[in-house]
Design a protein with these regions (language model features):
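Charged phosphate-binding loop/patch that engages nucleotide di/tri-phosphates or the phosphate backbone
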Residues: 203-237
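C-terminal binding/interaction regions
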Residues: 194-200, 210
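Acidic/His-rich, divalent-metal-binding segments that scaffold phosphate/diphosphate chemistry
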Residues: 43-110
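Divalent metal-dependent catalytic cores for phosphoryl transfer on phosphate-bearing substrates
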Residues: 88-190, 202
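Cationic, low-complexity basic patches in intrinsically disordered or flexible, solvent-exposed regions
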Residues: 12-13
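Cysteine-centered motifs
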Residues: 34-35
Length: 237
């Protein structure tokens, strides 16, 4: 059970929005003093991909973060067809990948990201489903990954960055000749791409209930069509 002293104003607004349990005192305080972002109407049209890209570019100016967003978007679109239990909205899954870190450049601290971004998304008309998945990809938020979309985002985010790092140190700078065995070897080398959280990769695979080798191959294949856009070099036609 969380209290108001344990969460910031941005965090309080998002938890309130998503129905995350707070103490009675905290809930009462929120109802009286928090200006929660405008609710999304059930029948409202969610922003499309072009609008999502515009939002990303509004808050993210750096090339590397934009490329990472494009990478995760591509993989999430592939995940929609592979992991969704029912008919998946591929664009919705892609938007989750595109926007999962859109606030990070401006609001990088753990008490801001992804809380500030989630509040912005609330006000822009994005669904709670998208917002919950984005909140869930940061384990410290405490928001459970209780949908296929949320689990897929968590399982692909860190791995996307790691695979791009693996490709960039190859002579070809390509994913086309990157083998799963090479990726696993580099995962064991803690000095390589040290900012990548190996524990998150492991946990993500476990939550998706897939084999690590299979997941690495799947993500490589999902990234190959967008190699040029994310700064890599396709060597096969």
């Amino acid at each position: 059970m969380l209290t108001t002293s344990e969460v910031s104003s941005d965090q309080q607004q998002v938890y309130h929005r998503l129905g995350f349990r707070l103490s009675f005192r905290a809930s009462l305080w929120l109802s009286l003093s928090c200006c929660v972002a405008a609710p999304v109407l059930q029948n409202s049209l969610m922003p499309n991909r072009a609008e999502a890209w515009e939002l990303l570019c509004e808050y993210t100016k750096g090339d590397s973060l934009r490329k990472h967003a494009l990478a995760v978007e591509a993989v999430m679109r592939a995940c929609a067809n592979r992991y969704a239990e029912g008919p998946a909205d591929v664009d919705e899954w892609g938007i989750v990948g595109l926007l999962h870190d859109f606030d990070y450049e401006m609001f990088p601290s753990a008490d801001q990201h992804p809380f500030t971004g989630a509040n912005i998304l609330c006000g822009r008309g994005y669904s709670d489903r998208i917002i919950r998945a984005i909140m869930g990809h940061a384990t410290y938020t405490g928001v459970p990954r209780d949908t296929d979309m949320a689990r897929a985002l968590f399982a692909t985010d860190e791995l996307c960055g790691f695979l791009v790092a693996c490709a960039l140190v190859r002579p070809t700078r390509s994913l086309d000749d990157l083998e799963v065995s090479s990726v696993k070897k580099k995962l064991k080398d803690k000095a390589f791409a040290r900012s990548v959280n190996r524990d998150d990769i492991k946990q993500g695979v476990e939550e998706l209930k897939v084999d690590l080798d299979e997941h690495i191959r799947f993500v490589i294949d999902a990234l190959r069509p967008v190699q040029k856009e994310i700064g890599l070099n396709p060597i096969t036609v």
